[in-house]
Amino acid sequence: MDADLTELVRQSAIKLKNSCDNLIPTLIKEQDKLNVIYNPLYYAWNPHNAYITRFSGNGAKILMMGMNPGHGMGNTGVPFGCPEQVKEFLEIKNLLVEQPRMNHPKRTVIGLEQPKSEVSGRRIWGLLKEMFETPEKTSEYIYIVNHCPLWMFNEKGQNITPEKLTGKSASQLYELCDQHLKEVVEIMGINVVIGVGNYAASRAAIALNDMDLIITKIPHPSPANPLANRDKGEYWKN
């Protein structure tokens, strides 16, 4: 494990955590569709930090990138962090997850003991377990991040994804997230970026347009994506 590299990834995550957190009041004010924003890098920093510490410095040269947190990372702090997979496969457990500073009653944060699964996370980490068997072996080849760390909702608690934002505050958020992505790619010496879904792939292409690497994509494994459900969830793996 490269401890110096890991510390650089950690510091970049801290910078993203703080800069995006500072932008939340502006996003709430300017984005009519946004009422509540969670920042898992803050309240779920303990498991996120454990994820960085254990897996960012093991030599991965492939970066898999999602769009922003969903139910999984929103509870566990780990990208695509289906609670079951985080505890049983990644063996990140018994760590305090605090509460978001603003809460929506339909989006309760329980933490690592959240009993509700996340299908996308179960599929992503389940596939990596099939391929590499252990999280340590996985992290020698692939490291996973999200482009944006914020989990965002309207007044009804419906998920609002980053591409639905508009205006100056949206551009500011994209810029912060693009810069973090570029930093992680440079720190880790990444040579392949896999966008999970079209949005992630397009942001990678924008953020990394001046870098010599391969950018590709896979279908998003969400059950909301028809491709992800074809052949009982097997099709998207190909």
Task: List the predicted regions and their residue ranges.
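Short, aromatic/basic amphipathic alpha-helical patches
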Residues: 204-210
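A polyanion-binding, active-site-adjacent surface
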Residues: 2-192, 201-202, 216, 226
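Active-site metal-binding loops of divalent metal-dependent hydrolases
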Residues: 68, 198, 221
